[in-house]
């Protein structure tokens, strides 16, 4: 198991908002989000296709940090993994928004949610890791929508989980 050094969660620049990674400023003043292959270009105040990344102050910010759309303790066998802690439990969670638009998505109500106020506010990375440990889970799963759009949140949650000896898995579209 890979061990990470203790990491302080990244600073919030506004409620549930952190500066995004993988951003480029374009010559015309727009910013480009390079988190996923869509490479959304945005002007100030515009949101990308995923709806959780937007242009603010000349950079892309992630607006769903610490806001999860659901939690569930699942058997690990429910995930697309092979022989990963067989018989164990995993704490699954996701956020709102998605970089895809699949009409057959079983999580459409979550992945295309625009009502952030219905999402929980009590879901900071350390809280998630602590909840997984209390529930007896061996791992935490980033799922329900493509976690690439909330990579900063997933990364910080992974650090918190690993500090507690928990593994992490990402269920992605790719």
Predicted regions and their residues:
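Conserved Radical SAM active-site core
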Residues: 55-174
């Amino acid at each position: 198991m890979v061990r990470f050094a203790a990491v302080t969660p990244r600073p919030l620049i506004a409620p549930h908002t952190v500066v995004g990674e993988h951003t480029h400023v374009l010559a015309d003043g727009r910013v480009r989000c390079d988190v996923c292959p869509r490479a959304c270009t945005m002007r100030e105040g515009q949101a990308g296709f995923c709806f959780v990344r937007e242009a603010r102050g000349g950079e892309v910010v992630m607006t769903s940090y610490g806001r999860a759309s659901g939690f569930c303790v699942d058997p690990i066998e429910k995930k697309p993994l092979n022989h990963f802690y067989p018989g164990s439990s995993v704490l699954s969670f996701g956020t709102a928004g998605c970089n895809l638009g699949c009409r057959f998505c079983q999580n459409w109500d979550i992945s295309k949610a625009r009502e952030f106020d219905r999402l929980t506010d009590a879901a900071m990375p350390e809280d998630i890791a602590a909840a997984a440990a209390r529930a007896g889970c061996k791992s935490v799963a980033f799922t329900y929508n493509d976690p690439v759009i909330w990579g900063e949140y997933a990364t910080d949650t992974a650090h918190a989980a690993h500090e507690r000896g928990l593994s992490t898995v990402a269920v992605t579209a790719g």
